[in-house]
């Protein structure tokens, strides 16, 4: 039963990460699996589950705070192209994304669909 709960938790983490960020599902899944595994191990060793939960919540707050402090705004077309190129693993795709974002503006929506046609 614990394994099923853990598996459902990991699936939900991946889905939420994809819905909110559109990226990072592998990292979120690995982190969730580690939290479940280590949490169960600690509870089995006698740790208080509520104490573990409070510790995890404090750690999440600290990590979030640290990430927000180190985050950098991506504003220019060149910055968008560089960031998107890294995420896509291809600078030319980064350029396409930056161009599309330039055309639709900050409030615009860009839909990307997979194509079966070579080169498109």
Swiss-Prot record:
Keyword Cytoplasm: yes
GO molecular function terms noted in the UniProt entry: ATP binding; ATP-dependent protein folding chaperone; isomerase activity
Known catalytic reactions: ATP + H2O + a folded polypeptide = ADP + phosphate + an unfolded polypeptide
Domain of life: Bacteria
Gene3D superfamilies attached to this UniProt entry: GroEL-like equatorial domain, TCP-1-like chaperonin intermediate domain
Pfam families xref list: Cpn60_TCP1
Entry's EC annotation: 5.6.1.7
Residue stretches spanning the membrane: none
Intracellular or extracellular location(s): Cytoplasm
One annotated Gene Ontology cellular component of this protein: cytoplasm
Broadest EC class assigned to this enzyme: isomerase
Binding site for ATP: 23-27
Alphabetically ordered keywords of this record: ATP-binding, Chaperone, Cytoplasm, Isomerase, Nucleotide-binding, Stress response
GO BP term, example: protein refolding
InterPro entries, A to Z: Cpn60/GroEL (IPR001844), Cpn60/GroEL/TCP-1 (IPR002423), GROEL-like_equatorial_sf (IPR027413), TCP-1-like_intermed_sf (IPR027410)
Summary of the function given for this chain in its UniProt record: Together with its co-chaperonin GroES, plays an essential role in assisting protein folding. The GroEL-GroES system forms a nano-cage that allows encapsulation of the non-native substrate proteins and provides a physical environment optimized to promote and accelerate protein folding.
Family the UniProt entry places it in: Belongs to the chaperonin (HSP60) family.
Family annotation (PANTHER family): 60 KDA HEAT SHOCK PROTEIN, MITOCHONDRIAL (PTHR45633)
Name used for this protein in its record: Chaperonin GroEL
Organism: Mycolicibacterium agri (Mycobacterium agri)
Lineage: Bacteria, Bacillati, Actinomycetota, Actinomycetes, Mycobacteriales
């Amino acid at each position: 039963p614990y394994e099923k709960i853990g598996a459902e938790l990991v699936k939900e983490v991946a889905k939420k990460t994809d819905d909110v960020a559109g990226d990072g599902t592998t990292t979120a899944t690995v982190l969730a699996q580690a939290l479940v595994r280590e949490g169960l191990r600690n509870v089995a060793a006698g740790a208080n589950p509520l104490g573990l939960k409070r510790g995890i919540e404090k750690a999440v707050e600290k990590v979030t705070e640290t990430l927000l402090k180190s985050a950098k705004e991506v504003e220019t077309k060149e910055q968008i192209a560089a960031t998107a190129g890294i995420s896509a693993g291809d600078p030319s795709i980064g350029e396409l994304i930056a161009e599309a974002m330039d055309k639709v503006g900050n409030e615009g929506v860009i839909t990307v669909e997979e194509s079966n046609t070579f080169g498109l």
